[in-house]
Amino acid sequence: MAARMCCKLDPARDVLCLRPIGAESRGRPLPGPLGAVPPSSPSAVPADDGSHLSLRGLPVCSFSSAGPCALRFTSARRMETTVNAPWSLPTVLHKRTLGLSGWSMTWIEEYIKDCVFKDWEELGEEIRLKVFVLGGCRHKLVCSPAPCNFFTSA
């Protein structure tokens, strides 16, 4: 990915909140243990509008030096919490916040990349995988015609 993402689970809604982080971002870090992700190198999140980057579908504020708006990615298929899915992402993240053993942050990062972004990339704007912009953000989500590809250049 072109930018590192900070993630935190909202257990009340089973929603994973993601936002780009970097040394140049002045946005407030997300509270809690999962928000305490060390900043990446200055080149990971550029100070300009990010229009040259390959992450299609993310609003331009994702790369703003003024601090990106929070992005909420939800995937009904991947975020289900059932007895038959004890290793679902919300369960893993909740156990980590309680200090219990769980899968590593590396696994969580891979999960996000492989399950959430890959689903969006392969399936396009699917009804069960949606992206919302929070915090009164006026930036619109712009997606190329299906399949929406986060990982190839425009």
Curated annotation (Swiss-Prot):
The keyword Transferase is annotated on this UniProt entry: no
Location of the region described as Disordered in the Swiss-Prot/TrEMBL record: 28-50
One term under GO cellular component: host cell nucleus
Stretch forming the signal peptide: none
GO biological process, one term: DNA-templated transcription
Domain of life: Viruses
InterPro entries named among the record's database cross-references: Transactivation_prot_X
Function: Multifunctional protein that plays a role in silencing host antiviral defenses and promoting viral transcription. Does not seem to be essential for HBV infection. May be directly involved in development of cirrhosis and liver cancer (hepatocellular carcinoma). Most of cytosolic activities involve modulation of cytosolic calcium. The effect on apoptosis is controversial depending on the cell types in which the studies have been conducted. May induce apoptosis by localizing in mitochondria and causing loss of mitochondrial membrane potential.
Designated name of the protein: Protein X
Organism the protein comes from: Hepatitis B virus genotype F2 (isolate Brazil/w4B) (HBV-F)
